[in-house]
């Protein structure tokens, strides 16, 4: 399955969104196909990660700040902490 990339373009006062085109190009060059989801509101990373996990994704890349990484990890971990 293709890696799931979850990006928060608002992270770093918009720096993540500005850097995204270059990051995406480098990810595609290194990994080939990637499946991208962008957050539209704060805290959406967790739900996006849970949806991706349910769809069978098992490789995740978080693009943003520490809150983005935390949200993605919370989505992957599951409610029972596993």
Name what the model sees in each region.
Residues 1-60, 70:
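ATP/NTP phosphate-donor binding region
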Residues 68-81:
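Short Gly/Thr/Asp-enriched flexible loops that form oxyanion-binding sites at enzyme active sites
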Residues 63-64:
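Active-site acidic Asp-centered loop
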Residues 36, 81-82:
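Secondary-structure boundary/capping residues
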